[in-house]
Amino acid sequence: MDPSGSDEDADADFDTQVIIQQSLLDVYKPGIAQHTPEAARLHSFPSDDYKKIAEAIETGKEDALAGFAKYHPAFDEANGNGWLPLHKAAVQLNKNILEITMNASEPSTWERTTHNGETALFLAVSSSLLENAHFLLLKGCNPNAKTSEGNSPLLTAVLKDAYDMATLLISHGADVNLRCANERTALHEAAKLGRLDMVKLMLASGAYPDARSSYGFTPLALAAQGGHTGIMQLLLQKGADVHSQASDSSSVLLEAVRGGNPEAVSLLLEYGADANIPKSSGHLPIHVAADKGHFLALKVLVPVTDIAAIKKSGISPVHCAAAGAHPHCLELLIQAGFDVNFMLDQRIRKHYDDQRKSALYFAVSNGDLPSVKLLLSAGALPNQDPVNCLQIALRMGNYELISLLLRHGANVNYFCRVNPLHFPSALQYTLKDEVMLRMLLNYGYDTERCFDCPHGERVHRFCTFEGWTSTVIKDTMFCEVITLSWLQHLSGKVVRVMLDYVDQVQICSKLKAVLEKQRLWPEIHFILANPRSLQHLCRLKIRKCMGRLRLRCPVFMSFLPLPNLLKAYVLYKEYDLFGQERSTGTW
């Protein structure tokens, strides 16, 4: 605390209090504040007369209300919500109450609104009180007065599905083309809600069929969103533009596809809608159908969509079906001949942090096994993306997905672009899981690089491990990783498994020092100190001659002139823990 500034602070607080008090006094000085009738109403409470009138209205006491008619000023008062007695009377079932109240009110109050901008007529319409609305209209109330939200009585009648009310309003001058909230007309709302009778009424009363909302949607587009084919047919017959586009260039056809009604899609195509017009994002109707999983709509769009338009968009519907996890749509597209190896255009890829390109990557990221199977069976390549599909599956720990990718040629020896290690990156996800580790090793993981250390038996120079961050790019050795304090306990098991897949290897001094403390060190030492069996060396030689691609190819293995038992040995089937349906994998 600073005592030197206490006097100044006290003076400042005193001055502030004086200013606040003076301003409050000024507000309530006669002639300064509340100098208008409107301000007086806002700052005053309802009088006793108002309360008596309101009670008579709400309880339906006609005689009592008629007796209060002489208190004209009270009929000009409003409560905290801005409701006049006339507003309260407008929502009563007894029309006589409204007549008495209106006759007692000054004509200047007939168009007065509540704090929400609602007139007495609007309140009667929103309460679906036809007789009250009729009476107010006969008195000359404005049928086109809008609320603060921009809603008109006619639009409210449409929302309430009150056909007779809408007819009444139109007969008394309601504008069917009046722009309401979001620049929508009553026809917009009727079309959106699928109210055919209302649409017919609006069109018969002169509604413009192609009015655009603030987002550029026409009534036809809104009807298409809901799949209201009867209304769409009527609008098209009245000349609605089938080629109209919204502010984002979304076509009516695209909106119909978004709704998923195949009959609506077919109807628009019959009237000449173009399936090759993209929205501003570049997406075509076929993309939307695939993404939403609308199978029947997709089936209609496939034959009418040009491949050139798809290429220009930079994204295939195959991507969309895979991203949305819709294998039934994916199967349809594959059967129709769409390329499963179509890669995202650069302008699309930049929206993804991982710079993904293939449809397979989307399916793997979703853990969508049926879609992955379909794509791989159709020839999808698993090594096309900057982040390898196998890496995503390993991160998930999904055995079946990993096995599926490996059987179709996923590269077990990929290297991450960030923090590349001296050994292939896939290993780091399997250190705690023998099932996944064996999967990688069985499919040709480069185990020898894990034992490749330039220091050998020499003492490693001391250095602190900098950690794995995007700012640390170095050729980190396996011995540096597995000897970390939080991984040392895994070193014995990992190295022991790896020895099943290599010939004689040298263990560097740093790794050896850690292994000597592990339970499996005697077994590891025995293997390292003795020649490997001829059977084991032959397996390694055969695998090396065959190559990784042939090893994972079932067709090639079936034609190999070897006994089945020997084939199984070459493929390390005795170590295929996932194939043996073992559920344990954590050490």
From Swiss-Prot:
Domain SOCS box: residue ranges: 521-576
InterPro entries, A to Z: Ankyrin_rpt, Ankyrin_rpt-contain_sf, Dendritic_Spine_Reg/Scaffold, SOCS_box, SOCS_box-like_dom_sf
Keyword Repeat: yes
KW Repeat (keyword) present: yes
Classification via SMART domains: ANK, SOCS, SOCS_box
Pathway of action: Protein modification; protein ubiquitination
Short name of one Pfam family: Ank_2
Disruption outcome: Asb14 silencing promotes cardiomyocyte nuclear proliferation after myocardial infarction in adult.
GO process terms (BP): intracellular signal transduction; protein ubiquitination
Per-repeat ranges for ANK: 81-110, 116-145, 149-178, 182-211, 215-244, 248-277, 281-310, 313-342, 355-384, 385-414, 416-449
Keywords: ANK repeat, Repeat
Family annotation (PANTHER family): PROTEIN VAPYRIN (PTHR24166:SF48), ROLLING PEBBLES, ISOFORM B (PTHR24166)
Protein family per UniProt: Belongs to the ankyrin SOCS box (ASB) family.
Domain remarks: The SOCS box domain mediates the interaction with the Elongin BC complex, an adapter module in different E3 ubiquitin-protein ligase complexes.
Known partners and oligomeric status: Interacts with MAPRE2; this interaction promotes MAPRE2 degradation.
UniProt function note: May be a substrate-recognition component of a SCF-like ECS (Elongin-Cullin-SOCS-box protein) E3 ubiquitin-protein ligase complex which mediates the ubiquitination and subsequent proteasomal degradation of target proteins. Plays a role in the inhibition of cardiomyocyte nuclear proliferation by mediating the ubiquitination and degradation of MAPRE2.
Protein name: Ankyrin repeat and SOCS box protein 14
